[in-house]
Regions:
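Short S/T/G/P-rich N-terminal loop/turn motif that feeds into the first structured element of a domain
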Residues: 1-46, 50-65, 72-92
Length: 92
């Protein structure tokens, strides 16, 4: 089942986010949609994933270690919500 995810990292800037992204090797398995942007005192990452298992495997095994290697903190917020709908919006 698809899931909607939110990660919020305190004190992360656009520059740090881009450094972490540059250290990764392409899109992770299982991601369907990604969006991110600044929030007060940090950075928010939203995603839609094929499953919570895919999200957890990437986040815990790849992304958080990469963030910490660049001097970033652990996420202050980590939410996973089952998606009722995950797909394009049809305009009609």
């Amino acid at each position: 089942m698809a899931v909607i995810t939110i990660l919020e990292f305190p004190s992360v800037t656009r520059e740090l986010y881009e450094q972490v992204g540059a250290a990764l090797s392409g899109a992770p398995d299982g991601i369907l949609y990604h969006a991110c942007g600044p929030i007060p005192d940090g950075w928010r990452i939203l995603g839609i994933w094929e499953s919570q298992e895919a999200f957890d495997a990437f986040t815990d095994g790849v992304y958080i270690p990469a963030m910490q290697a660049q001097g970033g903190a652990l996420p202050a917020r980590r939410d996973v919500t089952p998606a009722h709908h995950a797909g394009p919006v049809l305009r009609g």
